[in-house]
Amino acid sequence: MGAGDKTAAGMPRIGMGTAVQGPKADPIRRAVLRAIQIGYRHFDTAAHYETEAPIGEAAAEAVRSGAVASRDELFITSKLWCSDAHRDRVVPALRQTLRNLQMEYVDLYLVHWPVSMKPGRFKAPFTAEDFVPFDMRAVWEAMEECHRLGLAKAIGVANFSCKKLETLLSFATIPPTVNQVEVNPVWQQRKLREFCRGKGIQLCAYSPLGAKGTHWGSDAVMDAGVLQEIAASRGKSVAQVCLRWVYEQGDCLIVKSFDEARMRENLDVDGWELTEEERRRIAEIPQRKINLGKRYVSEHGPYKSLEELWDGEI
């Protein structure tokens, strides 16, 4: 397993995430450039992360320096933010993303959440008045237009339940290529993975280590006793055990570290595999979702409960 290992659709199995608190352009640019030099080829961003511009600068610098022969060697994912999840705002939003990236296309464009907000609502905290009903069909038709225009080589979604995917597939003329969701040993997504596999949708795991250090993250993954025991017995880090487990499920994974040693470690999970006994022990870890998406729930909004947001799949 390495940064160059790809899915059947050509998506590198390991991507570098860039969702950081209070993003600062220069450290991100330097980290992305170093990641390219180390071997990463997939970079995950979003309009909401405000990291598109430094990724674009790093990509251009990598081409100039010869670290990659051309932009085509990189796989760039970005996402449509909720305030642009309206039929007439999707294509303009992607065009702005491309200006930020200084690129002619993204490899993958995702609907960030199955949520719509009033235009201009970008930063939390959000109020009940910010939310409007999510017109899935209208938004997806505009996503399909992004693909037809050549602005996005592939389109997909993030944070969609089985039920929402079923609805989307009932009318999509271009089905989603990817569903990017939280996946880790504490939230294993067995039902969703099986559903996606049956529909030809690639599952992509964010927060495979539990997103410790983020506003919603948890120590639950890295502190799990089972994972610590397996790591100690195999001479691996807990992170390597987690990433290997996600990889063995057939998922793509997004890892985030700007520390070079960790960047290298996150790529280096090849040449070994978990035993059947280790897989069984991981399968028995009590399950709980970490990223609940509480900020998108309001008693006066379209989603009045977490049950409604996730269609009971929590």
Swiss-Prot record:
Q: Where is the active site?
A: Y49 (proton donor)
Instruction: Describe the reaction catalysed, as an equation.
Output: 2'-deoxymugineate + NAD(+) = 3''-deamino-3''-oxonicotianamine + NADH + H(+); 2'-deoxymugineate + NADP(+) = 3''-deamino-3''-oxonicotianamine + NADPH + H(+)
EC number(s) from the headed UniProt entry: 1.1.1.285
Query: Which EC class, in a word?
Result: oxidoreductase
Q: Which InterPro entries match?
A: AKR, AKR4A/B, Aldo/ket_reductase_CS, NADP_OxRdtase_dom, NADP_OxRdtase_dom_sf
Site for Lowers pKa of active site Tyr, residues? K79
Q: What does this protein do?
A: Catalyzes the reduction of a 3''-keto intermediate during the biosynthesis of 2'-deoxymugineic acid (DMA) from L-Met. Involved in the formation of phytosiderophores (MAs) belonging to the mugineic acid family and required to acquire iron.
Protein name in UniProt: Deoxymugineic acid synthase 1-B
